Amino acid sequence: IDEATQAIEPECLLPFLHGAKQVILVGDHRQLGPVITCRETKAAGLDKSLFERLVCMGIRPVRLQVQYRMHPELTVFPSNTFYEGTLQNGVTISDRQFEGDFPWPNKAKPMFFFNLLGAEEISASGTSFLNRTEAAQVEKIVNALLKSGVKATDLGIITPYKGQRAYIVNYLAKNGQLNPEIYKAIEVASVDGFQGREKEVIIFSAVRSNDKV
């Protein structure tokens, strides 16, 4: 079962109903878990995947410790925060060298945080959030990346909220400085919708913040 850590337990148990004698669970319980919106379901413990429950019971999973996606400098945070510093790099800095002329604050570390004063608001659906100021800044960063040589198909925008996703798509189409057809090639997705995939450059639109880091 692939992406088993995103599935609730009853979903993972379905193969047993068809006579399966062995089941291999593939996933990462340190990443995105099942998306549960019902309080009663969470209270019943169904917000935990079968994979994570088995790990908590003492069953040790086989961990793949070499990553081939990220620039080595980007590995440091997830390795130290989620994997006890055990992640290893299967790629070198030269393998992931950014060739464009984008003005990184530190070219040796191809990432940065952009602090904004805009506040979130409830989306038109009433069930999600959006941040207009943040969406406008995303458009500016997108334009800078495209002008520096990044292909639209190599660029992804991820946000935790469907309201923000819809707003960004609409904002790029109506307010983008470049040809609207270019923006259509940029994938804008929710966190769970993008799980397990990759792009050369990712912009993360957080929408909201709190006092915790």
Where do the PLM segments sit?
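Conserved helicase motor core of SF1/SF2 NTP-dependent helicases
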Residues: 1-213
